């Protein structure tokens, strides 16, 4: 019997994953629900989110570097659903690599060099400070910031900032020149 989470997904996603085993990833901090299949990953995100930019960037990166391939991207009134291919291997923060920095550092260095080698003249996604601050302002003004997962010294009585509004003001006033 199909579980209720899978049953609730859009048909375009469900047809790829129906009947397949998965685990739920609890590593990320994005607040998304991430289902890990043997050869695919499904990211379910509350809207609004930046998944459209991520999808556009993933499609643009295809063939340029090893990156997940977008299989299906769907949105409804509440969520966005990104089903992508799964890249096999360990993440850089895996215990294996953290205990073996002499293996990790060269891998990270090669990864940075690979990213730097990409010609970005036709890159469809612009992520500059002005755009990111505008998105942050929208999230703050519309009550879309969840501080429950923030570092303890960021907000509140013992924090550097009273609330997200104060942090946003500080970021706007202290932007690099």
Where are these predicted regions, by residue range?
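Charged, low-complexity, helix/coiled-coil-prone segments
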Residues: 1-6, 45-59, 169-177
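N-terminal charged segments
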Residues: 1-30
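An alpha-helical support segment within catalytic cores of ATP-dependent transferases
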Residues: 5-13, 117-177
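A generic structural signal for ordered alpha-helices
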Residues: 12-13, 20, 36, 48, ...
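Feature targets compositionally biased, intrinsically disordered low-complexity regions
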Residues: 18, 27-30, 88, 142, ...
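ATP-binding pocket architecture of kinase catalytic cores
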Residues: 23-128
